[in-house]
Amino acid sequence: MALRFFNDISRDVNGLFNRDFFHTNPLSLNISTTTENGVNFTLKAKQGVTEGPIQTSVEGRFYDRKEGVSLSQSWSNQNRLNTRIEFSKIAPGWKGDVNAFLTPQSIKNAKFNLSYAQKSFAARTSIDILQPKDFVGSVTLGHRGFVGGTDIAYDTAAGLCARYAMSIGYLAREYSFILSTNNRQCATASFFQNVNRYLQVGTKATLQSKTSSNMNIEFVTRYVPDSISQVKAKIADSGLTTLSYKRNLNKDISLGVGMSFNALQLTEPVHKFGWSLSFSP
């Protein structure tokens, strides 16, 4: 199995903390369908704030398995056009893609990404073809579960390192432990474990030494009572608590509901509630 790229080193714990919490959008709707010739269409709609505007986007994706080439194009009601072409069979271990954006405000960019991965080494580079100011590259090395990597953005115009990040850790089948830091003096320690087939737990400690001497600690858990539902809970030492419930109503429809509140200040008007409905016929 190929080694993870730098951005995926903390994939397990980050997915547990960020995925399937529905309180951020009061309303979210996803509809996905696939035609007989293999073209996938996806419609997404979400309401960022209560009584606010609804943001929508439609995306079409075609994938040629034989050649390893896919073409995706999406358009939103904010007139943002996104086109992505992916090449997954350039050579063994090599992948590449071109991702282009266009908006009415004349914001245009076209990023070219190239990656290579094998069992103990993974690397990825990215550059904006239209505005080649920054060159972004990452390297990851691994051996017997131990992994380490760095990510660097180099400003070619100024001739200096714009940002950097580093991570080291240990990845196993049932658990992982990661230490990370970056040039913004932010240090993070995270732990993830598959306790059993029903329960996952994770914790994260973050220190922003540039702005505060206090360490922020968060805990998260995911419980899967059966094959069609799950319950998640997340709490921070600040008292911010987030709960969510997701259930597959049938093989094509899933419903998710979530809420967040401050357990230390229940009288404060900071509560949020949201729900999500997904159709995949």
From Swiss-Prot:
Annotated function: Non-selective voltage-gated ion channel that mediates the transport of anions and cations through the mitochondrion outer membrane. The channel adopts an open conformation at low or zero membrane potential and a closed conformation at potentials above 30-40 mV. The open state has a weak anion selectivity whereas the closed state is cation-selective. Does not confer permeability to NADH.
Gene of this entry: POR2
Alphabetized PANTHER family for the sequence: GH26960P-RELATED, VOLTAGE-DEPENDENT ANION-SELECTIVE CHANNEL
Family: Belongs to the eukaryotic mitochondrial porin family.
Species, as recorded: Saccharomyces cerevisiae (strain ATCC 204508 / S288c) (Baker's yeast)
One CC-aspect GO term: mitochondrion
UniProt protein name: Non-selective voltage-gated ion channel 2
Annotated binding of ATP, by residue: R11, R19
Entry keyword annotation includes Transport: yes
Matching InterPro entries: Porin_dom_sf (IPR023614), Porin_Euk (IPR001925), Porin_Euk/Tom40 (IPR027246)
Primary subcellular site in the record, as a coarse category: mitochondrion
GO biological process: one example: lipid transport
CDD domains associated with the record: Porin3_VDAC (cd07306)
Subcellular location: Mitochondrion outer membrane
GO MF annotation terms: ATP binding; porin activity; voltage-gated monoatomic anion channel activity
UniProt keyword annotations, A-Z: ATP-binding, Ion transport, Lipid transport, Membrane, Mitochondrion, Mitochondrion outer membrane, Nucleotide-binding, Porin, Transmembrane, Transmembrane beta strand, Transport
Transmembrane stretches, start-end: none
